[in-house]
Structures are given as structure tokens and as C-alpha cells.
Amino acid sequence: MTQTLSQLENRDAFIERHIGPDAQQQQEMLKTVGADSLNALIGQIVPQDIQLATPPQVGDATTEFAALAELKAIAGRNKRFKSYIGMGYTAVQLPPVIQRNMLENPGWYTAYTPYQPEVSQGRLESLLNFQQVTLDLTGLDIASASLLDEATAAAEAMAMAKRVSKLKNANRFFVAADVHPQTLDVVRTRAETFGFDVIVDDADKVLDHQDVFGVLLQQVGTTGEIHDYSKLIAELKARKVIVSVAADFMALVLLTAPGKQGADIVFGSAQRFGVPMGYGGPHAAFFAAKDEFKRSMPGRIIGVSKDAAGNTALRMAMQTREQHIRREKANSNICTSQVLLANIASLYAVFHGPAGLKRIAGRIHRLTDILADGLQKKGLKLRHAHYFDTLCVEVADKAAVLARAEALQINLRSDIHGAVGITLDEATTREDVLNLFRAIVGDDHGLDIDTLDKDVALDSRSIPAAMLRDDAILTHPVFNRYHSETEMMRYMHALERKDLALNQAMIPLGSCTMKLNAAAEMIPITWPEFAELHPFCPVEQAEGYHQMIAQLSDWLVKLTGYDAVCMQPNSGAQGEYAGLLAIRHYHESRNEGHRDICLIPSSAHGTNPASAQMAGMQVVVVACDKNGNIDLADLREKAEQAGANLSCIMVTYPSTHGVYEETIREVCEIVHQFGGQVYLDGANMNAQVGITSPGFIGADVSHLNLHKTFCIPHGGGGPGMGPIGVKAHLAPFVPGHSVVQIEGMLTRQGAVSAAPFGSASILPISWMYIRMMGAEGLKQASQNAILNANYIATRLKEAYPVLYTGRDGRVAHECILDIRPLKEETGISELDIAKRLIDFGFHAPTMSFPVAGTLMVEPTESESKVELDRFIDAMLAIRAEIDRVKAGEWPLEDNPLVNAPHTQGELVSEWNHPYSRELAVFPAGLHNKYWPTVKRLDDVYGDRNLFCSCVPMSEYQ
């Protein structure tokens, strides 16, 4: 049959590339699960009353090349000026060896958070290096593996200061007046819900204020002044005040460590260690504290432990601090860090080493000195005599200066009264400095770089002697070994080989949606048009960004059934927080600020209660029935008891139990009946797109995990994006921004993230995904995710009971396998199964969540039937091994499961086990074998012997 031109153009080709099972495989799987078609299967699973009659109108599918061309044209509307605005964001030079071998490498960006340390030793080592960089530069005792951004880190520092403060009756937090404005904005937002009184004043007036539990200072102020706070910190410590200091990684290469001056907490952005500005993110924040405060630290901490053979191994330490365990009592609701970006910064430090970093920092400072000297020679006055990279220059005719700068395609900081701000960076050249002279003085400035260089080289006093670093940094061999590109390339590859990512196997983690992050989706994030924009550049220079964000927002509005979308939250946890704040402020606008009770089902993700607590709400748990559904009677009773104090319910759909609850609309109606709002957690949105929507169901607000449903990669534990969709009545209450206030932003509320659009530079990934899939492709993705989960559940249910099912024994896009009966019979646990899967080349499913003693499996639509069968075969083989333990063929204390995973070292060592070497290490044959580099981790040892900095190189050999 002759094909038409439209058929030959094959504009929906990407759909087949994104969805794993082809048409024939889908039919085979449908036959296995007992359904005639995908539509019939969905009809059996999703309640009829919430199914959409027509798919959302987000356009037709298109090819990868057409989408890239379309987005390239949009990106071309951005204007790439030289931005010297500063305020925590500078241009960088990302080493190409890191860009190509790490940032653009799926072996790095498709990995998951390292909850399974045996398959994560490579990025754990890199994160440990990041912590070592942080420790060396801050002069403190313990560091985290990154937070979301500098402003969020400041808010976390405030919360931590209150937790550890001995001044229990003090309720005031002092912020120095010259912190970055976006930092102050986020701190104020967080303080409001905690009931803290934020005082903003000059740092030298802090001692005039009483009842202060914590202080936030900035070592290099937002307009560039270097502060020696050593004396002030000593006076504050005498009053038992917790002192936090915001610092800059590059400045710290030359400046004394705040920890050495007595600071309790030091934080800042690691952006300028190789991470592009990207119109605001994503960027990793660093965070360090004194050892005595380690158990009150927010975020993830990488620690050194031992494996079962006594070998050094790395893991995430002290996880009992985190929300997935402590829920509303957690130190923070943050469950996303910025691993990919922290690893870029870490590898940047490894590649340049201490000498290279000092050279870069020295060059930046020298050029700043030259600029300062030249301007002063022309009669201009500097506001500050002490600076590192930023000058605050008083100008008589500011408008003329800014006009000349614009003509030269230069952005200066313009919000300082009577002055302009200029921040130089590692990309600044002597030619750039000459252009700055032209902008500020005029074309006839008559200044010569070499002459000025000789002058400042002889007499530079811009860094006070007391503030010059006098100790060595980055002395560990890892920072002094890999400086040739060959060595660096091999080091990164060696780290990558230790880890298991999507480029090697399915990652069947429930509630995590580890789907394909297509190459075409990833390409635009490194385009200079997106990567090089400063988040506070004039809005007319970012027209391409605004067009892309507006289109993506419009698509998300249509896909969610909401009326508006706010792009600011830069993680799912931040999205939850922002959504709950919108609810809180909505109630307050109606003079119902007393509404502070948040109902949360017992099955909820731990982030939900942690976010509710952060938003100033009381958590009341709603029971689930024996089938895992929300107990409507208990819900109604709790809602009635809350009465006029009911704020909202947080509910996940499909439920965290992997079921489409038939009564979801009734749940919404009950909460609305008592004046509450419905927060529908977007974690499982991949089972809704094109089939139903939160707005259609009856919810008022949701966050969307763009790093799950909409293809932003997990990056080994971040970045993420968590924009919120809201109904119209909540739109005025979503986060705003104090620096960037443009037409189209919905609100003047406080910010939750440092940048107005969060991690804007990764939004093109989701734009590309939706554009290439189109409405029909997105629906097919959800349908196939559901098919894949039901295929696994059907084939495994005889070996492993499926804990919760809906109508007709069906599951949603994930299923929970109940291991508890097997453990009772045999002693083999879900942990043993998870570790044995490593020998088969798989990352484990989610363990013991939401029910202890279970495994939650989410295959996603991107996995082919071949890969699903490989996983099923592995699980069935493991079940057969469990049966051999049960039959007494292998003792409980010595079998392939309890000894898993098995390493190459064991293969060539003395063998005293009752099973063969071949069964141990090649249970699935020889093809494409993944080798873990360590055996099972000793978690207890790691927490009892906490060590969170680099170990000797010999430990890795």
C-alpha cells in the first residue's frame, strides 16, 4: 500500500522512541494481563467519573529535529549581554572535559539518589569531595552534600539556628542589611510560618537588639564590601547567639575561612565553580556547621563507613534526620539536593586543584583591582575600599552610564542609589575591563591595562591583611592529581563505572518515575542562549526564556486542569511548601488565618507532613482501610473535629499504595464541605497525564515533579523542579520575587527560591518532552506506564503477593510487593532481595515505603517488554533462591541473598559458601554484567563512627 507524505514524514516518531514496548509487545502484555486494548485496561482501572472525555489540547507530536529547531528559534530571542550584575550569580567557564564526560553523560545524569550505596559509590565519592571542598573553604567540621540554592540554605540556617539555640525564649533572627535581597526574601518567607521576627539592620548594630537567637552575616556584602566579622562574632558567641555567615566559594579561595573566625554555620552558592548561571539555576548550595550541631543539619550528608567485608565504603549518613523517616519532626522537608551541580563543582575543584583555583581567584581579583584603580584615576569614588570581585561605583549621571553599557551589550547592577555595581568573574578578560571603562568613563578614557596592572601589583590593599587566607586548602591527593585532561577523563569514567544508572538498566523505584531522559531533551540546556543569562538581567533580554516558560506553563495548565502555574519552586518539596503557603495566605485573606490543621493520610510520603510543619500547620493523620484507601469515615470525623480550623488535606493520586481510589472526588467534597482546600501531591502525575487531571478531580493546588513526569533527569539526587498549579482563587498567593517583578507574574507574595523561575535552565527539557510527544503521545505514555506496572504485578503476584489492588485486581502505575510473609517463613527480608537484585544488574525497588517490609515497583512507560521480562525473571529467580533457603538447602546465615551483593574480589578469593561462585556473581548469565565495587554497607558503623571528609587514596584502590 502506498504511503502518504504525511505518513512518511512520521511526525510522531519520538513517541515510539520514548515508549518502551512496541505495538506487538503491547499486545502480548495486554494478553498476559487479560485486557483487549490499552483503552479497555484504563477503563478497568481509572474511575469512570474522573476520566477525561477529550485529551488536553497541547498540540500534536513533532520530531526531535523539528522541536530542536523550534526551541532554537525561541532561545535566539534571548540577548547574550555580558552580565556584571553579581548578587550571587556570575559567568563561568565550565571545563569542556566536565561538560562532555559528566554533564552530558547519561551515566551521571540519569542516576537516582544514592539510597542504595552499593550501586552509587562513584557519585558518593564525588559528593564526598564536594564536602571536602566545603570543609576546607569554610573552616568548619561537617558539611552537607548540597542544598537547593543559597537563599534556601539561608532559610535552613535560620531554622537550624533556632533548633540548636540555648536561648529558648528568644524569637528574633537578625539579618545584616547587606545580604543579597533574594536571600532576605526567602528568609522572610520561612520566618513568617515559623513565627520568627526578622530584624534587618547594619551588622554593627546587631548588639543593640535583644532576644536574638541567630544572626545572618554576609562575608562579602551584596555590594562588594569585605567584612572582618571576627570581633563581632566573638561578642555574639559570648551572648550564646548562633552565627551564620553567607560566603562565596571563589572568594573563600583567597579570604579567611568564616569558621576560623568563630561562625557556627557557613553557607553559600557553589555556582561559580563551573555551573552556568542558566537564568537562575539549577545551582548547588554548600552548607557547613560545627560538629556539635551535626544531628541538626538539613539535607544529605555523605559519610565513610565499612562494607560487610570490612572495606571502606561510602553512604548517606544519619538519614534519621530526614523527612522520609521523621516526617513532621524532620529537620527540613527538603528531600532533593543538587547532586549533579554539586558534582560539577566538585570536579571543577578536582580539575583545577588548589593552585588553579588560586590562579583563577587571583586573576578575578587582579582585574577588579585594575578596574578600581582606573576608575579612581578618572575621579570616580568607590563606596567600599575592601573588595574581592565587586565594586560599588558612585556615578554622577547613572542613566548615561547605563545607556553606554547597554550600547556595549553590558549589564551593570542598577538598583543601588547613586551608584552602579560591577562584579567580575573567571570569564572576564582585559578586553572586558576596557569595555567597562568605556561604559563608565567614556570612549576617551585613555587607560591602559598593563600600566594599571603594574600600579596595583605594587600596592593592592583591597583585601585587608587580617582577611587573607593563611592556611592551605585542598591538600588531599584527589585535588592534586587529575589536572591533565586525560587523567581527568579517566577519573570521571572510573567514578561512573561504579554506579548503576538508566544507561545500563531499568531503575524500578516506586514513586520515583525513572523514565527516559531523551538526548534531544537534554541538548538545549547547554546552549549558550539558555546557559549564559543572569536571572536579574533586564527582562527584555530574556524574551526567549519568557516565551518558553509561558508555553510550558500553558501546556501544564491544560494537562493539570488548573488555571495558573508558578514556576518558582526548584524541587518537589519546595513545591509542596509553596502550595501550602498559598493555601495559608488564601485563608488569611478571608480572615480565616486560624485554619491551620492539615489532614494527611497515613500512606503519605514523608515530605508531606514535613512540608505542612514548615508551613506552620498542625498535622492530623487520616487512617487508611485494609485495602489501602483513605478511610472516608475517619476522614469525615477528622474534618468535623477540625471544623473551622481545617486548612487542607494533602492527598496523592493515584495513592502511594499504587491504586486509583474510587472515592477521590468524595474526599475532595468532604474537605471542601468543611472549608478546607485540597492539595493533590503531583508525585504520581505520570499516571494521570491525558487520562485525568487534578483540577478535573476537584483539587485546588498541586506541585508537579518535572523531574519525574516531565523528563528532567534525577541527576543522582537533583536537580528537580516542582512548579505548582493552582485554581484561580489561589493564584494571587503563589510565590513572587523581590528583585524580578515582571508583567505576568501572578503575585507579590514572598519567594521560596532564590531565582524567580527556580531552575529555569532545565525547563527546556520538559518543553521538549511535551512538544515532541503531543497530546496523544502524553496519554500513551501514561497508559503504557499503567500497562507495564500491571504486567509486572500479574507475572509476579504468585511469587510475591501484591499488597494493594483496585477494581478487578488492577494496580495503577506502580505496585507494592509484600515481602512480610516470606520473611516470616524464611527470614529473608526485603533488604536481602534488594541487594540480591544488584547481582542481577538492577537497582532495587523502593524499600519499606509506604509500608514496612515491602518493595514498591514503578517500571515507567520507557521500559521495553524485554527489560521488564529481565526484571521479572530476576525476581522469580530470587524467589526460587528463597525457596531453597526455606527448604534448608542453604542456611539462613549463608546464602546468595544475605551475602548479596557479590563483588569481583570475591570471585577470585577463597570460596567457602554452600553455593557456587557462578550463581553468586552471574545469576543472569555473562551478558552485560554490572559489578558493584563494595559489599553490603554497615549502616550502624557509619552512623556511630561518623566521618564525612575525604579518606586516603589507598582506600579506593
Curated annotation (Swiss-Prot):
| A GO CC annotation given for this chain | glycine cleavage complex
Modified positions (N6-(pyridoxal phosphate)lysine) are 708
User: Any keyword Zinc-finger?
Assistant: no
- Function of this protein? The glycine cleavage system catalyzes the degradation of glycine. The P protein binds the alpha-amino group of glycine through its pyridoxal phosphate cofactor; CO(2) is released and the remaining methylamine moiety is then transferred to the lipoamide cofactor of the H protein.
Source species, please? Answer: Klebsiella pneumoniae (strain 342)
Q: What is catalyzed by this enzyme?
A: N(6)-[(R)-lipoyl]-L-lysyl-[glycine-cleavage complex H protein] + glycine + H(+) = N(6)-[(R)-S(8)-aminomethyldihydrolipoyl]-L-lysyl-[glycine-cleavage complex H protein] + CO2
EC identifiers of the protein: 1.4.4.2
PANTHER family membership: GLYCINE DEHYDROGENASE (DECARBOXYLATING) (PTHR11773:SF13), GLYCINE DEHYDROGENASE, DECARBOXYLATING (PTHR11773)
As for family, the record states: Belongs to the GcvP family.
HAMAP family xref list: GcvP (MF_00711)
Q: What is this protein called?
A: Glycine dehydrogenase (decarboxylating)
List the CDD domains: GDC-P
Q: Origin, by domain of life?
A: Bacteria
Q: Name one GO biological process term.
A: glycine decarboxylation via glycine cleavage system
Q: A single Gene Ontology molecular function, please?
A: pyridoxal phosphate binding
Subunit comment: The glycine cleavage system is composed of four proteins: P, T, L and H.
Q: Which Pfam families match?
A: GcvP2_C (PF21478), GDC-P (PF02347)
The record's section on NCBIfam families has:
gcvP (TIGR00461), PRK04366.1 (NF003346)
